[in-house]
């Protein structure tokens, strides 16, 4: 914790899509559960020309659309917390008026900054100009934080002129998901897994982040970024680091992030033969015809909408264990999961093909369903006169069913509450971000050097056939 709980929250981009779908519903839900300090005031700012009343109407419509009815209790009192100040971030004098609107917090100010990368520097200068960057102010930064290591340096250096690292909260919303946090509990609160969590007992790990959607209004950003920078550089590498990290000394921000960055720095440079890129063409998803990427974009493009990578972590625990990463748009289903495949038993005592055991698998479902499945080998019931027959049996834990009482929360609820209260454990430190970019930039450099262009795949499929071959040449099948 950084010493104070804020009693003012300043939301940049307060009339944008993220605020409408995630931030305002999350804050209202926290308020309904009495998790926000009664003194907390929330000031929204954006270019939209609204007053307090207009912003409250905007927020009410957002809550009615995106927050379930059973979580809207006390919506009227939440709306009374809200006020609004229009702002052109490129004009310094606007920050004087914004500072007047924010007022003088008794305890401290938390800022949530979601803006285009080009506006980070002028916004930070404006906050300094308006006196909104003092010792009792912390800032949360929503991606994208650059498009490569160099631009990330520029943004982080600009932020550091006003906010030291202990008051800078870089957001990766995947870390706010309950099952992602549960990965640490699964590993470090259960003695059965940790002794096996290494190259001696694990054959390989798969991490899949699949989307059914296409561009969905992110045309400009996505065509500049592509799947590697949009998904792998942040979300997927954070998941990988949680799977692979050493046990931290304790569960606090410094200890957890120290171990994550060790993993990221141990990532082996990827050869071009260990990657596959793709771009979707027209097809069908859920029985509905969908256009190809170029059709949605309105022009030809070499941007990848799919990437598969065979990664390695060069340290003692994970030497030569492949980590297969796969993400893409317009895939058959929306799913995020981690699959850990253990090695086969070294010798089977059971004779015959029917007794051939399959390796154990641990599957951690992150979205849409939050579940944990461990596959074990068991004897098929019956009188086995020709020898025991074995079959894999799944042990399923559906997390919402296992914990029937707690609400299923939006990932941003956890992150906004931690930003307000000053807990950095689930936020990304600068050295993590830079280690991620360094690895991703090297992959992009390999692509450019070898003139790699995306292979095509049909929307509704699991990507280019080359992605299947990437795993199958190692005797591995993607978990689907």
Regions from the PLM with identified roles:
Residues 1-140, 145-480:
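Secretory/organelle targeting and membrane-embedding segments
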